[in-house]
Swiss-Prot record:
A Pfam family reported for this protein in Swiss-Prot or TrEMBL: Ribosomal_S13_N
Single GO MF descriptor: small ribosomal subunit rRNA binding
Highest classification ranks of the organism: Eukaryota, Fungi, Dikarya, Ascomycota, Saccharomycotina
InterPro entries, sorted: Ribosomal_uS15 (IPR000589), Ribosomal_uS15_arc_euk (IPR023029), Ribosomal_uS15_N (IPR012606), uS15_NS1_RNA-bd_sf (IPR009068)
Keyword Ribonucleoprotein found: yes
Organism, scientific name: Candida maltosa
Family: Belongs to the universal ribosomal protein uS15 family.
Gene: RPS13
Protein's name in the database: Small ribosomal subunit protein uS15
Domain of life: Eukaryota
Any one of the GO CC terms: nucleolus
NCBIfam families: PRK08561.1
HAMAP family: Ribosomal_uS15_A (MF_01343_A)
Keywords, alphabetical: Ribonucleoprotein, Ribosomal protein
């Protein structure tokens, strides 16, 4: 998929393993993987960080293959899911950082333009999450209260 606000084509991507079952050398049970996911979530890690740790330290290529559920679904069933979706959270965090930079550097026109692009992405993503009922229908991004969302 191409980039939203630049000319990049985005041709590089990772290949998902074709096999839909756990490899023969994999010894962990699905309950042990779920326990690991819950343990890392309680430490405050995001779902993607949990997936990276499971891949690198425990040899779990995909949690869905081993457990039957994705990491976020495991977190939701245990009441540990983040209140904001991860991609929206990090966009808001980036917008807060750019806005803080602009308070110190008022003449930085490029950062002002980039902030507009970031906030456009936030509004677009929030509209999507409202339509699929991940966010409540009256949820709205406001730059004044954004720092409270990511704190």
């Amino acid at each position: 998929m191409g980039r939203m606000h630049s000319a990049g084509k985005g041709i590089s991507s990772s290949a998902i393993p074709y096999s839909r079952n756990a490899p023969s050398w994999f010894k962990l049970s699905s309950d042990e993987v779920v326990e690991q996911v819950i343990k890392y979530a309680r430490k405050g890690l995001t779902p993607s960080q949990i997936g990276v740790i499971l891949r690198d330290a425990h040899g779990v290529s995909q949690a869905k293959i081993v457990t039957g559920n994705k990491v976020l679904r495991i977190l939701k069933s245990n009441g540990l899911a983040p209140e904001l979706p991860e991609d929206l959270y990090f966009l808001i965090k980036k917008a807060v950082a750019v806005r803080k930079h602009l308070e110190r550097n008022r003449k930085d026109k490029d950062s002002k333009f980039r902030l507009i692009l970031i906030e456009s992405r936030i509004h677009r993503l929030a509209r999507y999450y409202r339509t699929v009922s991940v966010l409540p229908p009256n949820w709205k991004y406001e730059s004044a209260t954004a720092s409270a969302l990511v704190a």
